[in-house]
Amino acid sequence: MIDLKLLEKDFENVSKRLKLKGVDENNLEEIKKLFKEKKEIKTTLDKLLEQRNILSKQIGNFMKNGEKDKAEEIKKEVNSLKEEISVLEEKLKTIEDSLLQKALVIPNIPDEDVPIGKDEDENVEIKRVGEIPTFDFEPKPHDELGEKLDWLDFTRGVKLAKSRFTVMKKDAARLERALINFFLDHNREWGFEEVYVPFMVNRETMTGTGQLPKFEEDLFKIENEELYLIPTAEVPLTNLFRDEIITNLDEPIKLTAYTPCFRKEAGSYGKDTKGIIRQHQFDKVELVAITKPEDSDKMFDEMVACASNALEKLGLPYRQLMLCTGDLGFSAAKTIDLEVWIPSQNKYREISSVSNTRDFQARRAKIRYKDGKKNKLVHTLNGSSLAVGRTLVAIMENYQTKDGNIQIPEALKKYL
């Protein structure tokens, strides 16, 4: 959640940064109006409280001097003040609650070094790694390869569920499992502790990482239950520490988990309708880190390097992109995307996003750490290492042969 104290103190500059992420100016003006009302009420309230305290002391003095009549008169004034104070306190609480609700749907402030831009077309390429493969034949898309090899059964996926669900068979199923184990082992080598988490979480957990209340339409909710299927392991991993004070954070907490992920993909109608690039259910191995504020930049670089190294081990060509302000996610202050080469599309496609949310999620989820005698907000980071289904797509397309078979990357052979 955005720091409301910072927004109130430096409204013009902060709102200017927020507009770069597409925040509606009317919403910001409503918040500004509430800040003004809050300030006016607090000023009046402070005066009334001061007046009440002065009168209360006078009552004590009159009672000591035996002047009960005068004391009773002032008591009436104090009681009248109490009623005014009670009304104002209720108004103040209403305004503060309203500010809190509005803050829950305001995104994080982008870092100063994030490039300014409206959408993905203005993201900035950092570097490319690996050679794009050349074929002496027309490379086939993964869905065509998958059906020919009887690896991917789209028809039965629809029969069992609906569109954007797929049945994986034979070597596709084995490769999916191999990739999960490979990614978990790889992340552990980079110092991330493996965790197994619930695939369903409650509303407070979804709110803690920023999925609720703004993105409810993209979540699968369990009917008659306050439970949601997770869209990413970032949600349960980060919220492990919700409402907690971490006593020792001298070293960052580094976690990794495999989970299936569930997304309605609202707003994706007509995009990636073929194959398994965009599914309602997909596997992902996630990285999450919790750090002191001064350690989060270093951890961000480490997480980008970890995910990048996984692609390099698999021999997959990729590029790194710094996302511009208009393409940043809701909770992110800064994001680097990794995009892997997809031959049939003749372009790079996202396979990982690594984000530093600074103290945005920590403020929502109340995750703090001990710094001497003070409790301070942590920084939280997350990133895919990696999206399993999209890695399978990249392997199928980059490692395909002229006869329609798929070669296996050396790094995966021991897992098969």
UniProtKB/Swiss-Prot annotation:
Superkingdom to which the source organism belongs: Bacteria
Record keywords: Aminoacyl-tRNA synthetase, ATP-binding, Cytoplasm, Ligase, Nucleotide-binding, Protein biosynthesis
UniProt-annotated binding residues for ATP: R263, K264, E265, E350, I351, S352, S353
Gene Ontology, cellular component aspect: cytoplasm
One GO process term, biological-process aspect: selenocysteine biosynthetic process
Gene3D superfamilies assigned to the protein according to its UniProt record, in alphabetical order: Bira Bifunctional Protein, Domain 2 (3.30.930.10), Serine-tRNA synthetase, tRNA binding domain (1.10.287.40)
UniProt pathway annotation: Aminoacyl-tRNA biosynthesis; selenocysteinyl-tRNA(Sec) biosynthesis; L-seryl-tRNA(Sec) from L-serine and tRNA(Sec): step 1/1
Catalytic activity entry: tRNA(Ser) + L-serine + ATP = L-seryl-tRNA(Ser) + AMP + diphosphate + H(+); tRNA(Sec) + L-serine + ATP = L-seryl-tRNA(Sec) + AMP + diphosphate + H(+)
Principal place of residence: cytoplasm
Top EC class, one word: ligase
Molecular function in Gene Ontology: ATP binding; serine-tRNA ligase activity
This enzyme's EC code(s): 6.1.1.11
InterPro entries: aa-tRNA-synt_IIb, aa-tRNA-synth_II, aa-tRNA-synth_II/BPL/LPL, Ser-tRNA-ligase_type_1, Ser-tRNA-synth_1_N, SerRS_1_N_sf, SerRS_core, tRNA-bd_arm
Residues the record lists as binding L-serine: T232, A233, E234, E286, S384
Subcellular localization: Cytoplasm
Pfam families: Seryl_tRNA_N (PF02403), tRNA-synt_2b (PF00587)
Description of its domains: Consists of two distinct domains, a catalytic core and a N-terminal extension that is involved in tRNA binding.
Family: Belongs to the class-II aminoacyl-tRNA synthetase family. Type-1 seryl-tRNA synthetase subfamily.
Role played: Catalyzes the attachment of serine to tRNA(Ser). Is also able to aminoacylate tRNA(Sec) with serine, to form the misacylated tRNA L-seryl-tRNA(Sec), which will be further converted into selenocysteinyl-tRNA(Sec).
Subunit note: Homodimer. The tRNA molecule binds across the dimer.
Protein name: Serine--tRNA ligase
Source organism of the structure: Nautilia profundicola (strain ATCC BAA-1463 / DSM 18972 / AmH)
The organism's taxonomic lineage, starting at the top: Bacteria, Pseudomonadati, Campylobacterota, Epsilonproteobacteria, Nautiliales
Gene encoding the protein: serS
